[in-house]
């Protein structure tokens, strides 16, 4: 009995730690989100960026998104561009400059595609879906983890119908995933990117990753 009680206490402590880390991670994501939406000096707003590509493509959303993705992939594989960004955006201490710079570009790309789909970037659910897209997280799986049964693929419309407490739990899961993947150890073990300070960016990895993220964003925000 004593052993079982100890195991339960240890399990609860582990869950509590994950919640705390998740909240910490979500706060960091919030800072990255605000910074990406605000942009660096002289950059267009995300809304203006989305409108520019829509205008260039005659209002065809998927075509505009594909064109946007190609441009962002180019940015994420250009060492000079990422190095320049590193000095202009404020990054959490646990994130290397190249990772933060790539995420800045990727968040703006996802957000612009969301705008093309008619979504507001001030909507909390949209913000959560932006990061689920960035982190390659299937929201349907997260819903199951927090006790919500759903037979269908999770959508923005479904999330909007759920209580705020559920969204909070989802955000904690996203925050924990973020710290696990992009914490200092995670960068080395999972992403294997050489810091910009060393003068090299793993352009091939950024190209593949950014392209995949863009494709996911189209599925989430444009293919309803």
Locations of the language-model features?
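Selective recognition of hydrophobic, aromatic-rich stretches within alpha-helical transmembrane segments
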Residues: 92-100
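Terminal, membrane-proximal amphipathic helices
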Residues: 1-85, 104-224
């Amino acid at each position: 009995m004593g052993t079982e009680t100890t195991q339960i206490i240890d399990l609860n402590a582990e869950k509590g730690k994950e919640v705390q880390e998740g909240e910490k991670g979500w706060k960091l994501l919030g800072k990255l989100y605000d910074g990406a939406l605000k942009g660096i000096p002289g950059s267009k707003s995300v809304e203006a960026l989305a409108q520019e590509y829509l205008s260039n493509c005659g209002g065809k959303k998927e075509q505009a998104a594909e064109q946007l993705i190609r441009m962002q992939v180019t940015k994420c594989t250009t060492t000079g561009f990422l190095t320049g960004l590193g000095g202009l955006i404020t990054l959490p201490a646990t994130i290397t400059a190249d990772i933060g710079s790539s995420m800045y570009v990727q968040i703006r790309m996802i957000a612009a595609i969301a705008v093309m789909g008619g979504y507001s970037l001030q909507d909390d659910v949209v913000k959560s879906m932006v990061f689920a897209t960035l982190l390659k997280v299937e929201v349907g799986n997260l819903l199951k983890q927090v006790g919500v049964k759903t037979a269908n693929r999770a959508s923005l419309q479904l999330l909007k119908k759920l209580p705020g407490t559920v969204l909070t739990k989802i955000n904690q899961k996203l925050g924990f995933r973020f710290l696990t993947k992009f914490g200092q150890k995670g960068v080395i073990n999972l992403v294997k990117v050489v810091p910009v300070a060393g003068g090299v960016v793993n352009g091939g990895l950024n190209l593949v990753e950014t392209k995949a993220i863009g494709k996911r964003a189209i599925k989430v925000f444009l293919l309803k």
